[in-house]
Design a protein with these regions (language model features):
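Surface-exposed, low-hydrophobicity segments enriched in Gly/Pro/acidic/Ser residues
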Residues: 1-209
């Protein structure tokens, strides 16, 4: 579930839903149409909470923070056109003073960051052959209507990158930005030494180009 507008800090989000698995229907929470007298106002309904009024990072694994989307990034535009769309991931290498499309050490030395993040697995004809370009696949790598890039991995610049680096402590401490996913925005913004990854490219959309 994703929302088009952010909830206020004191607002709560909860859902009830049903799904089918192996031909059997399962229900989570209660629906107002279930017909039970217990569900009629002013009685309470049982729902699955996705966001509490005190939603915040919790490194001990409690609460709902771990359910937050940690692989979707906004381009700041809508109605993105796939024609001549280009997107790259770069890393600001302070030792050479330039933006690079790869890291120059570890198991992924020289490997384009698009491939590291599984955003380049196909060629222009959708054959399974990386071609150095972003795979523009609606619903899998991009929501063109609302300008959202979808990384097909969780915590791309955190735990995923750490795994690609072989979980080498020296390399993960140098390159990984785990605080981007398990800290507040204010804390993450203060870690300028880790905030070195950028999405660059060009595109045409309703609000930007």
């Amino acid at each position: 579930i994703s929302l088009k507008s952010a909830l206020n800090q004191d607002e709560v989000l909860a859902v009830a839903y049903e799904y089918t698995y192996n031909g059997k229907v399962y229900q989570v929470g209660e629906f107002s149409t279930d017909g039970s007298e217990e569900l009629r106002a002013p009685n309470a309904m049982a729902l699955k909470m996705l966001k509490s009024s005190a939603n915040a990072p919790d490194k001990k694994g409690r609460g709902t923070w771990d359910l937050m989307m940690k692989n979707i990034y906004s381009l700041g535009a809508t109605s993105i056109n796939s024609d001549k769309f280009e997107l790259y991931i770069t890393y600001r290498n302070d030792s050479v003073g330039t933006e690079m499309q790869y890291l120059n050490e570890g198991p992924i030395n020289g490997k384009q960051l698009l491939r590291v993040m599984n955003l380049d697995r196909l060629d222009m004809k959708n054959n399974a052959s990386p071609d150095g370009r972003f795979d523009f696949v609606e619903g899998l790598t991009i929501y063109a209507s609302n300008g959202k890039i979808i990384f097909p991995v969780l915590e791309p610049f955190g735990s995923h990158l750490a795994a690609q680096l072989g979980n080498d402590t020296r390399l993960t401490n140098k390159y990984c930005f785990q605080e981007l996913y398990d800290s507040t925005l204010i804390v993450a913004q203060e870690l300028s030494e880790k905030n070195k990854f950028h999405l660059t490219g060009k595109y045409k959309g309703t609000n930007s180009s």
